[in-house]
C-alpha cells in the first residue's frame, strides 16, 4: 500500500487520473498507481465477464434428439442406451442451469449406470457425450481403487484426473463427466454383508457414496495418498455427472431367477431359459444389482440404468464401415498415404465380425483382428511402388490367404502364402 509523503508531491491514479486527495487509497506498483475506485470497477468488469462465460457454457445444451443423432455418428446400435443417456445428460445440464437460479425447488442429480458386455460401446458412448457437450472428461478404473488407508488408489484420485483434464480449472471440472469402468468388479462377494473387511469391494462402494451424491472433496494436487501438512484442491462434486459401467457377467442368471419366480405354469421355466442375453439385460432392475453385490446406498445414487446389448454380426460389420472414424476408413486412409487403394470385400467383413464374436471381445477385438490380417501388407507395401490396389477377401480372413494385389499395369497377384489373422 502506498502512503502519502508531502515531499514527493501529488500522486495520481494511472488509470483515472484522480489525485491522492480525491480518492481514499492509492496502491503503488513499479512506476504506476491505481486508486480504490478503479480497483472496484475492474473487479466488477472481471466478475461480470466470468459470470457471462459461465452462463453461456450450458446455455445451449443439445436436445435429447440432437444428442442421439450425434451418438449415431460414432456408435452403432444400442438405441435404448442412447435414448436413456441422451435424456439423462440433457436433464443433468438443464438441472445445473436451473439450480444456478434462485428457486424453492432444487433438482437432484441422476448419475447413470451402464450394463453391457465387453466391447459393446460403454466407454465410447461416455467419451462421445463429453465431446458433444465440450466438458472435461475422465476415465477411472474401479479395480485400482481401495478403501482409504489400504494399498491402492484413493477415490479422490478419480477427481484429480478430471481436474487434470480441465487443465486444473476447478470450476470447469465441477461440471465435467467421470466414467468409472469395471464397476461390477467392486461388488461384494456375496449378497450378505461380510464380517471381514472387503477393502477393494464394498469398501470402495462406501468410499464413492459421498462423491457420487455431491460433496466438497479434498484432492491431493500430485495424486497418491493424503498426508498431514499437505495442500489440497477443493472440488465440489454436486454437478459432476458420474457414469458407472461394467459387464456384470452372470447378472442374466439373477434376472432369469427373478423372472422365473413370477411366471407360473407348465413350460414357464423353459420360456425364461429361451430368452436371449440382450432381452434379459433390458429387464434389469435395482434388485438384480443388489443381488449381484452392489450395496443399496450405491444403487440409490445411480438411478438411471442403461443396458447395452451384445453386438451381433450385422452390428459389427456396420461398426467396421459406418461410423466417422470406422476402422476400414482408418486403414484405407493409412494405405492412401502410400498411394495404394484398399478394399475389404463384404465376405471379408463378415469373417472379421465372426472372429470377434468367437473371441467374445465385441467391437474392441476388431482392431486386433485387422492388424493381424494387415501386418504383412503394411510391412511390404511401403517398399514397393508397383501396387495400385490391395483387396482383402473372405479367404484372407478365414483361411489366412494373402490379399489380392492389383499392380499398376493391371496384373492381379494372389499368392498362396499364408498370413496370420
Curated annotation (Swiss-Prot):
Pfam families per record: AAA_2, ClpB_D2-small, zf-C4_ClpX
CDD domains: RecA-like_ClpX (cd19497)
Binding of ATP, residues: 117-124
GO MF annotation terms: ATP binding; ATP hydrolysis activity; ATP-dependent protein folding chaperone; protein dimerization activity; unfolded protein binding; zinc ion binding
InterPro entries listed in its UniProt record: AAA+_ATPase (IPR003593), ATP-dep_Clp_protease_ClpX (IPR050052), ATPase_AAA_core (IPR003959), Clp_ATPase_C (IPR019489), Clp_protease_ATP-bd_su_ClpX (IPR004487), ClpX_bact (IPR046425), P-loop_NTPase (IPR027417), Znf_CppX_C4 (IPR010603)
Keywords, comma-separated and alphabetical: ATP-binding, Chaperone, Metal-binding, Nucleotide-binding, Zinc
Gene Ontology BP, a term: cell division
SMART domains reported in the protein's UniProt record: AAA, ClpB_D2-small, zf-C4_ClpX
Binding annotation for Zn(2+): 13, 16, 35, 38
The keyword Metal-binding is annotated on this UniProt entry: yes
Domain ClpX-type ZB: 1-54
Recorded GO CC terms: HslUV protease complex
Family: Belongs to the ClpX chaperone family.
Free-text function comment from the UniProt entry: ATP-dependent specificity component of the Clp protease. It directs the protease to specific substrates. Can perform chaperone functions in the absence of ClpP.
Assembly with partners or alone: Component of the ClpX-ClpP complex. Forms a hexameric ring that, in the presence of ATP, binds to fourteen ClpP subunits assembled into a disk-like structure with a central cavity, resembling the structure of eukaryotic proteasomes.
HAMAP family: ClpX
Name of the protein described by the UniProt record: ATP-dependent Clp protease ATP-binding subunit ClpX
Species this protein is from: Bacillus pumilus (strain SAFR-032)
Amino acid at each position: 500500500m502506498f502512503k502519502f509523503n508531502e515531499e514527493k508531491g501529488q500522486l495520481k491514479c494511472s488509470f483515472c487520473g484522480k489525485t491522492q486527495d480525491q480518492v481514499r487509497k492509492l496502491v503503488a506498483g513499479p512506476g504506476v498507481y491505481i486508486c480504490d475506485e478503479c480497483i472496484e470497477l475492474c473487479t466488477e468488469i472481471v466478475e461480470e465477464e466470468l459470470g457471462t462465460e459461465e452462463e453461456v457454457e450450458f446455455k445451449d445444451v443439445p436436445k435429447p434428439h440432437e444428442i442421439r443423432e450425434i451418438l449415431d455418428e460414432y456408435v452403432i446400435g444400442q438405441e435404448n442406451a442412447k435414448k436413456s443417456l441422451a435424456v439423462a445428460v440433457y436433464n443433468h445440464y438443464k438441472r445445473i442451469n436451473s439450480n444456478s437460479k434462485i428457486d424453492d425447488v432444487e433438482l437432484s442429480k441422476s448419475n447413470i449406470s451402464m450394463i453391457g458386455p465387453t466391447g459393446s460401446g460403454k466407454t465410447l458412448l461416455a467419451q462421445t457425450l463429453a465431446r458433444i457437450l465440450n466438458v472435461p472428461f475422465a476415465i477411472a478404473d474401479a479395480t485400482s481403487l481401495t478403501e482409504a488407508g489400504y494399498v491402492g488408489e484413493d477415490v479422490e484420485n478419480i477427481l484429480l484426473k478430471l481436474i487434470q483434464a480441465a487443465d486444473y480449472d476447478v470450476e470447469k471440472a465441477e461440471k465435467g463427466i467421470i466414467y468409472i469402468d469395471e464397476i461390477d468388479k467392486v461388488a461384494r462377494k456375496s449378497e450378505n454383508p461380510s464380517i471381514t473387511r472387503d477393502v477393494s469391494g464394498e469398501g470402495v462402494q462406501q468410499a464413492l457414496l459421498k462423491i457420487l451424491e455431491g460433496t466438497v472433496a479434498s484432492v491431493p494436487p500430485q495424486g497418491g495418498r493424503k498426508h498431514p501438512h499437505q495442500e489440497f484442491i477443493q472440488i465440489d462434486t454436486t454437478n459432476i455427472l458420474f457414469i458407472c459401467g461394467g459387464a456384470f457377467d452372470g447378472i442374466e442368471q439373477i434376472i432369469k431367477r427373478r423372472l422365473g419366480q413370477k411366471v407360473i405354469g407348465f413350460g414357464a421355466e423353459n420360456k425364461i431359459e429361451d430368452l436371449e442375453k440382450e432381452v434379459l439385460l433390458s429387464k434389469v432392475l435395482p434388485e438384480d444389482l443388489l443381488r449381484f453385490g452392489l450395496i443399496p446406498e450405491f444403487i440409490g445414487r445411480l438411478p438411471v440404468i442403461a443396458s447395452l446389448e451384445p453386438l451381433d454380426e450385422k452390428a459389427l460389420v456396420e461398426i467396421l464401415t459406418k461410423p466417422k472414424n470406422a476402422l476400414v476408413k482408418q486403414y484405407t486412409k493409412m494405405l492412401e498415404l502410400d498411394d495404394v487403394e484398399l478394399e475389404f470385400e463384404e465376405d471379408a467383413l463378415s469373417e472379421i465380425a465372426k472372429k470377434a464374436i468367437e473371441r467374445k471381445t465385441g467391437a474392441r477385438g476388431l482392431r486386433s483382428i485387422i492388424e493381424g490380417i494387415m501386418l504383412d501388407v503394411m510391412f511390404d507395401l511401403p517398399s514397393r511402388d508397383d501396387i495400385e490396389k490391395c483387396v482383402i477377401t473372405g479367404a484372407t480372413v478365414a483361411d489366412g490367404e494373402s490379399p489380392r494385389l492389383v499392380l499398376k499395369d493391371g496384373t492381379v497377384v494372389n499368392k498362396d502364402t499364408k498370413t496370420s489373422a
